[in-house]
Amino acid sequence: MSAPLSLFVTGTDTEIGKTFVSTALLHGFARAGLRAAAMKPIAAGAYQRDGVWRNEDADQLDAAANVALPATIRTPFLLKAAAAPHIAAAREGVALDIDTIVGAHRRACERADVVVVEGVGGFRVPLAGTRDTADLAVALGLPVVLVVGVRLGCISHALLTADAIAARGLAIAGWVANRVDAAMRFADDNVDTLRAWLEREHGAPLLGDIAHMSPPSPEAASRSLDVNRLLGALRETAPR
């Protein structure tokens, strides 16, 4: 039996479509015949339904996955305040422990063929003490998919984020252009520039260019993603 596959989804910023792309990937993996699960290890911003605290991003991941994970595995740390996680955690007296997340990820991988782990905010978001989400990605040891919100300033944001990922010794399995600004001028030129620079500097291929969608459709977006190429990259780096 082959080892389960997993990847870490990060982005150039918050609100650039990490959850949207993660759910699109889940649809693509399911269409490829894989048992696909998702984790949102740290979620900040919760609402209550039927006496249970929930998170909108986690709900979307659950809806797209074809393997359901217990909430304690899918989201070990659910914070009520919609704020930076270290701020929300401090206000709630919660210690954001990376080892707890690593253990939850191990259990998730026992239940699925592929596990999508969605980060929180950008690549470097403080968690506790001197540790941040980059440390979480390193502890998980997963290849990274970078989501680039295609809007003004995205070239610098993407290149800086890619450099930060590489500086931590992590492989960039690829990147996704998510066109969040329908009115952006020269969007194609920005994507072409990033395609050349990220391939040349980090060997990171463009896995998909997702058009602006209103309303967004993860299932439709999944058809813009080269899931087979991503799976090939994940299999190359998976433990033997």
Curated annotation (Swiss-Prot):
Which pathway is it part of? Cofactor biosynthesis; biotin biosynthesis; biotin from 7,8-diaminononanoate: step 1/2
For the biological process aspect of GO, one term held by this record is: biotin biosynthetic process
Q: Does the keyword Transcription apply?
A: no
Q: Name one GO molecular function term.
A: dethiobiotin synthase activity
Q: Can you quote a single GO CC term?
A: cytosol
Name the chemical reaction catalysed here. Answer: (7R,8S)-7,8-diammoniononanoate + CO2 + ATP = (4R,5S)-dethiobiotin + ADP + phosphate + 3 H(+)
Any idea which positions bind Mg(2+)? T19, D57, E118
Q: Which InterPro entries match?
A: DTB_synth_BioD (IPR004472), P-loop_NTPase (IPR027417)
Assigned EC number: 6.3.3.3
**Requisite cofactors:** Mg(2+)
Note whether Metal-binding occurs among the keywords.
yes
Listed A to Z, the keywords are: ATP-binding, Biotin biosynthesis, Cytoplasm, Ligase, Magnesium, Metal-binding, Nucleotide-binding
Q: Where in the cell is it found?
A: Cytoplasm
Major localisation: cytoplasm
Q: Which residues form the active site?
A: K40
Which parts of the sequence bind ATP? E15, I16, G17, K18, T19, F20, D57, E118, G119, V120, G121, N178, R179
Q: Which family does it belong to?
A: Belongs to the dethiobiotin synthetase family.
Role this protein plays: Catalyzes a mechanistically unusual reaction, the ATP-dependent insertion of CO2 between the N7 and N8 nitrogen atoms of 7,8-diaminopelargonic acid (DAPA, also called 7,8-diammoniononanoate) to form a ureido ring.
Which NCBIfam families has this protein been placed in? bioD (TIGR00347)
Assembly state and interactors? Homodimer.
Protein name, as recorded: ATP-dependent dethiobiotin synthetase BioD
